[in-house]
C-alpha cells in the first residue's frame, strides 16, 4: 500500500520575496559577502529586452553580428551569377554590392538602446577586477553556464552578461513570475494574464568572481528563526567532507543562528523564512554568504524533500546535515540544469505522444534531405560541386 503525504502549503508573502532581493540583505553583511556592484533600477526597456525572443548583443569589438551566406539564408541577389560568370569584374562588383546589402540587413545594433547601462556594466566589471558573476534580484543564470567557456558564469564584458541573462530560464522566471508561489497577493494586485502586477524595482548585481571550491558550499533552510536542515550544495561525492562534518555543521549553525538570523530579525523583521547559501573555505574560521533566497518550492531542496522541510520540528535539538555519500551518489547522478539545455520542441514532445511522433517524422525528413544532398555532391579537381 502506498503511503501518501499531505501537501504542505508555504505561507509566503510578497514582502518576504522582496526582502530577499540582493540589495536588501547584502549591505547588512559587509564582511561576509564578496565585493559587488549594484546597478539599479533597471529601465523597463532593458527588462523587455531580456525577456524578448532572440539574442542581440552589443559587441564591444564591432557592435555587429553578420550572418554568412549559405544555403539556409540565400539572398536573391546571388541568383543568376552563372549567366555572367565570364565577366569577372561584373561578377565581383555584383558580389561586393550584394554582400554589402546583406550585411546592412543583418547588422544588429543593440548597444544603442542602453548605452549608459552598458557603460555602467563595463565600468563595474573593471572595478571588480575584470571578472564578475551577474544576477538580478534573486537568481543567477547558472542554468545558462553551458554557453560560457569552461561551463562557468564568469563574465569579462557586457556581451557575456547579456548573453547569460537572456539565455537563463531562472532569470526569465524571476522577471515574469516573481510572486507565483505567494500564498495571498494584495487585493488590488491580482494576477493578469498569468503575470504579477506588483511593481518590482529590478536590479543588476555584479559580484566579483571567485574560484570557489564547490565542495564547501552549503544550503541552509531557515523558518521562524530555526534551522530546519543543512545540505551539501554540489551534488557530487567528496571523501574529505565526512571527517569535516562535525566542524562544518557547528560553524554553519553558529553563523546562521547568531549572525544571519539575528541581523535579519533586526533589520528585516518580516523575513521569517528564507534559504541561505554559504561558503566555508579553509581553514573554516570565516563563512561567506553566497545568496539568500525566498523560502519557496522553485528553490532546489537538494538532499531534502520539501515535505521533510515543511513537516520538520523546528524545536528539535538535532539539525539534519546531509552530504552525498558513496551509497547515494547514484541517486543524484544527473547533469545539473540539463532541462534548460534542451529545445522546447523536445520538452513538449516528451509530454505529448502525438508531438513526439511528429518530431520523429520531422527529424527523419531532415536526415533524408541531408543524405540526398550528400549523394548529389561530386568532387571536381578537389572541390565539392553540386551535380
From Swiss-Prot:
Its recorded name reads Translation initiation factor eIF2 assembly protein
Q: What does this protein do?
A: ATP-dependent protein-folding chaperone for the eIF2 complex. Binds to the gamma subunit of the eIF2 complex which allows the subunit to assemble with the alpha and beta subunits.
GO CC list? cytoplasm
**What InterPro entries does the database record attribute to this sequence?**
CDC123
In alphabetical order, the GO MF annotations are: ATP binding; magnesium ion binding; protein folding chaperone
Pfam families for the chain: D123
Binding-site list for ATP: 135, 138, 140, 142, 207, 209, 217, 219, 233, 277, 291, 293
Q: Which UniProt keywords apply?
A: ATP-binding, Chaperone, Cytoplasm, Magnesium, Metal-binding, Nucleotide-binding
Q: Out of the domains of life, which is the source?
A: Eukaryota
Write out the annotated subcellular location.
Cytoplasm
Q: What is its main location?
A: cytoplasm
The organism encoding this protein is Lodderomyces elongisporus (strain ATCC 11503 / CBS 2605 / JCM 1781 / NBRC 1676 / NRRL YB-4239)
The record's similarity note reads: Belongs to the CDC123 family.
- GO annotation, biological process: eukaryotic translation initiation factor 2 complex assembly
Q: Does the keyword NAD apply?
A: no
- Intrachain S-S bonds: none
Give yes or no: UniProt keyword ATP-binding.
Answer: yes
Q: Where does Mg(2+) bind?
A: 291, 293
Amino acid at each position: 500500500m502506498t503511503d501518501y503525504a499531505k501537501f504542505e502549503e508555504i505561507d509566503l508573502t510578497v514582502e518576504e520575496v522582496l526582502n530577499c532581493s540582493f540589495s536588501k540583505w547584502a549591505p547588512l553583511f559587509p564582511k561576509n559577502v564578496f565585493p559587488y556592484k549594484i546597478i539599479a533600477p533597471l529601465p523597463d526597456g532593458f527588462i523587455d529586452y531580456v525577456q524578448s525572443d532572440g539574442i542581440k548583443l552589443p559587441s564591444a569589438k564591432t557592435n555587429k553580428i553578420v550572418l554568412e551566406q549559405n544555403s539556409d539564408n540565400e539572398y536573391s541577389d546571388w541568383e543568376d551569377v552563372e549567366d555572367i560568370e565570364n565577366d569577372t569584374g561584373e561578377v565581383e562588383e555584383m558580389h561586393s554590392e550584394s554582400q554589402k546589402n546583406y550585411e546592412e540587413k543583418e547588422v544588429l545594433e543593440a548597444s544603442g538602446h542602453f548605452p549608459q547601462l552598458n557603460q555602467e556594466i563595463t565600468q563595474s566589471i573593471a572595478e571588480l577586477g575584470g571578472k564578475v558573476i551577474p544576477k538580478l534580484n534573486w537568481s543567477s543564470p547558472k542554468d545558462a553556464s553551458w554557453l560560457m567557456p569552461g561551463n562557468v558564469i564568469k563574465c569579462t564584458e557586457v556581451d557575456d552578461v547579456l548573453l547569460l541573462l537572456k539565455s537563463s530560464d531562472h532569470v526569465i522566471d524571476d522577471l515574469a513570475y516573481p510572486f507565483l508561489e505567494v500564498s495571498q497577493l494584495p487585493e488590488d494586485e491580482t494576477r493578469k494574464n498569468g503575470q504579477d502586477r506588483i511593481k518590482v524595482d529590478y536590479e543588476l548585481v555584479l559580484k566579483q568572481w571567485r574560484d570557489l571550491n564547490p565542495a564547501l558550499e552549503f544550503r541552509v533552510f531557515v523558518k521562524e528563526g530555526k534551522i530546519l536542515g543543512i545540505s551539501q550544495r554540489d551534488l557530487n561525492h567528496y571523501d574529505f567532507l565526512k571527517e569535516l562534518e562535525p566542524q562544518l555543521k557547528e560553524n554553519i549553525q553558529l553563523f546562521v543562528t547568531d549572525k544571519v538570523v539575528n541581523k535579519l530579525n533586526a533589520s528585516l523583521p518580516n523575513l521569517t523564512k528564507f534559504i541561505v547559501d554559504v561558503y566555508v573555505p579553509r581553514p573554516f574560521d570565516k563563512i561567506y554568504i553566497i545568496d539568500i533566497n525566498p523560502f519557496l518550492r522553485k528553490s532546489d531542496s537538494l538532499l531534502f524533500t520539501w515535505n521533510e522541510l515543511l513537516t520538520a520540528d523546528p524545536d528539535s535539538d538535532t539539525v539534519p546535515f546531509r552530504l552525498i555519500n558513496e551509497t547515494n551518489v547514484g541517486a543524484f547522478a544527473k547533469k545539473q540544469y540539463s532541462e534548460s539545455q534542451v529545445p522546447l520542441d523536445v520538452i513538449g514532445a516528451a509530454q505529448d505522444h502525438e508531438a513526439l511522433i511528429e518530431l520523429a517524422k520531422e527529424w527523419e525528413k531532415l536526415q533524408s534531405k541531408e543524405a540526398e544532398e550528400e549523394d548529389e555532391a561530386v568532387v571536381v579537381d578537389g572541390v565539392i560541386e553540386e551535380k
